[in-house]
Amino acid sequence: MYAVIKTGGKQYRVQAGDLLVVEKLEGEPGAAVAFGEVLMLGEGEAVTVGAPTVDGAVVSGTLLETRKGEKVKIFKKIRRQGYRRTRGHRQFESVVRVTSVAGAGKEAKWEGTIDLTPKVILDARARGLGDAAVPATIPAPVEAAPAKAEAAPKKKAAPKKAAAKTEEGEA
């Protein structure tokens, strides 16, 4: 069973178990996400098209991570003027695992397990360092710094020097 959903101004065709990269969604990793704007449901030859959405249909998922996407380069140029500017921008995106597609009295569920292992640990395992090296690589949560002691008074500015006098007798 598949569905066509709309989120972030874009449409996606999804099935249970799919990994979906969408515009940024609010929530922590592991949070449940529901997409209620289902435009179409399909199973084999049977297709249900909504007008504009299918009533009672919902696609559920789990938020895996929120990250920055690929960099988009912005290049401005005015020819023959020596004017060139390059900037870049990375949009936030969320990765969602679709866990179920439900509607029209039917439901398709994904039977897998969701692993929320941080990327740092996965990278260490891939390099063959094992889990023993991982705790040293994960940064500890930053606590608020203690308030600074009373700041020293600022120094006074040095007095300005008098302008040098010139002799007016020579012309």
From Swiss-Prot:
> Any idea which GO molecular function terms this record carries?
rRNA binding; structural constituent of ribosome
Q: What family is this? A: Belongs to the bacterial ribosomal protein bL21 family.
| Domain of life, per lineage | Bacteria
Extract one GO cellular component term from the record.
ribosome
Q: Where is this region: Disordered?
A: 144-171
Q: How does it assemble?
A: Part of the 50S ribosomal subunit. Contacts protein L20.
Identify the keywords attached in UniProt to this record, alphabetized.
Answer: Ribonucleoprotein, Ribosomal protein, RNA-binding, rRNA-binding
What residue spans carry the Basic residues bias annotation?
A: 154-163
A single Pfam family it belongs to is Ribosomal_L21p
* SUPFAM superfamilies membership: L21p-like
Q: Which InterPro entries does the UniProt record give?
A: bL21-like (IPR028909), bL21-like_sf (IPR036164), Ribosomal_bL21 (IPR001787)
What biological-process terms (Gene Ontology) are attached?
A: translation
| Function as written in the Swiss-Prot or TrEMBL entry | This protein binds to 23S rRNA in the presence of protein L20.
Q: What is this protein called?
A: Large ribosomal subunit protein bL21
